[in-house]
Amino acid sequence: MPKCPKCSKEVYFAERVTSLGKDWHRPCLKCEKCGKTLTSGGHAEHEGKPYCNHPCYAAMFGPKGFGRGGAESHTFK
């Protein structure tokens, strides 16, 4: 019986969601930053952890600079 990577409890077939090559409980598959519940294949991954595509993954790991949502977007020089 596979174990959920988030809570380490056994994942039964009826409650299983497969994502990132692992079996999760549906409520355990959440964005690491904001906690939003994610759907299988409808999210991004960084170092084996799930993130919602927008805004969390884009803000944390996307391109930085003017107009990209990074720290420099709102800096006037």
UniProtKB/Swiss-Prot annotation:
PTM-bearing positions, type Omega-N-methylarginine: 68
One of this protein's GO BP terms?
cellular response to antibiotic
User: N6-acetyllysine is carried by which residues?
Assistant: 9, 22
InterPro entries in UniProt: Znf_LIM
Q: Residue limits of the LIM zinc-binding domain?
A: 2-63
Q: Which terms in the GO cellular component ontology are assigned? A: cytoplasm
Q: Name one GO molecular function term.
A: peptide binding
The family database entries (SUPFAM superfamilies) matched by this protein are listed as: Glucocorticoid receptor-like (DNA-binding domain)
Which keywords, in A-to-Z order, does the entry hold?
A: Acetylation, LIM domain, Metal-binding, Methylation, Zinc
Tell me the function of this protein: Seems to have a role in zinc absorption and may function as an intracellular zinc transport protein.
**Protein name, please?**
Cysteine-rich protein 1
Which classification does the entry list for the species? Eukaryota, Metazoa, Chordata, Craniata, Vertebrata
Q: Quick one: which gene encodes this?
A: CRIP1
